[in-house]
UniProtKB/Swiss-Prot annotation:
Protein's organism: Mycoplasmopsis synoviae (strain 53) (Mycoplasma synoviae)
HAMAP family, A to Z: Ribosomal_uL1_B
Disulfide bonds: none
Annotated signal peptide: none
Subunit structure: Part of the 50S ribosomal subunit.
Any one GO CC term of the record: large ribosomal subunit
GO molecular function, one term: tRNA binding
Entry function: Binds directly to 23S rRNA. The L1 stalk is quite mobile in the ribosome, and is involved in E site tRNA release. Protein L1 is also a translational repressor protein, it controls the translation of the L11 operon by binding to its mRNA.
UniProt keyword terms in alphabetical order: Repressor, Ribonucleoprotein, Ribosomal protein, RNA-binding, rRNA-binding, Translation regulation, tRNA-binding
Primary gene name: rplA
Matching InterPro entries: Ribosom_uL1_bac-type, Ribosomal_uL1, Ribosomal_uL1-like, Ribosomal_uL1/biogenesis, Ribosomal_uL1_3-a/b-sand, Ribosomal_uL1_CS
Descriptive protein name: Large ribosomal subunit protein uL1
Amino acid sequence: MAKKLSKNQQKVRALFDANQAYDLHEAIELAKKTSYTKFDASVDLAFKLNLDVRKADQQLRGSVLLPKGTGKDVKVLVVTNNPEKQKLATEAKADFVLDAAAFEQKLKEDDYNFDVIVADPAMMPILGKYGKKLGPKGLMPNPKTGTVTPTPEKAVEELKKGKANYRTDKAGVVHSLIGKVSMPTESLVENAQTLISLIKKLKPAAVKGTYMQNLTVSSSMGPGIKIKLEK
């Protein structure tokens, strides 16, 4: 039996044709119009790619610096025992700069008042101990996203400017944030173009046939709006 749509969902469905693909600007406008949350919803792109995710070289994961930012004030925690790196991270406006002992104490207290952890590579043995806590929360640092780095201050600067992560799920779909509903459509379009260009460049050499099969944009809890794919 088909799931009954709520009144909000019915109103939203009336605003667009679920079977039609729109140009990028119009699709983003529709994603904003179909957002019915009371908070400033995120706007995300989802790429359905022709990938065999069982193969390591076809698992896309990384980060992209969005030219217009993410629209979000990201709280960054840096963990390092190096006094010079601590000083540089503080100057880069990291919200928390902790040594290993203070970091472990924070995790033991389940104090997660931050969004991202940036770690000095020397801290990885410490972080590994807390993988079961950090992993499910999406907080485990990773070299591919630039959050395990010998220059944490640079990572802090990029995160504060507007760095977004992307990764492939088990179905070969790559998801990434491009901003917030409150941002101007033109800014979201520019961010989307930057991300689309990057994903195209990352096409694995082994992929045959159509690489980008489908592309949608949506707000938090909103419907996916199809975007026309350039030939």
